[in-house]
């Protein structure tokens, strides 16, 4: 059995950006951890082909989209599409930590396979055809 898995540790103390994509050897989408110091803002920018999703992990982000500010708190997400200008800003007195994900092209859809347990052999089945396992005993 070939195993294709990578692991890394997020560093919330990083100066500006941790390029997680490289650390995990990802090719199909980008993922970056971004830390904005109080009062810091990034460049106004756009992407030609990729959607970008921002997930706020800590603090309050002001995401400016085509000149309109949108405030996002912890556990809130925003998507900005290709060709749309955006700027990430932190007008607060606390740092902001964001996970940014970007991808171009179309989503592959449901390409998952599932097994009942680790001992099951074969190519796997559609996930909806495999019942969820019982909860772990507490």
What role is predicted for each listed range?
Residues 33-37, 46-64, 101-104:
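Short, conserved beta-strand element in jelly-roll/cupin
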Residues 38, 49-50, 68, 84-85, ...:
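A generic "binding-loop/recognition-motif" signal
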Residues 1-29, 43, 109-138:
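A short, N-terminal "cap"/entry segment at the start of jelly-roll beta-barrel domains
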Residues 67-83:
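Short acidic-glycine-tyrosine-enriched beta hairpin
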Residues 27, 64-68:
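Short strand-coil-strand connectors
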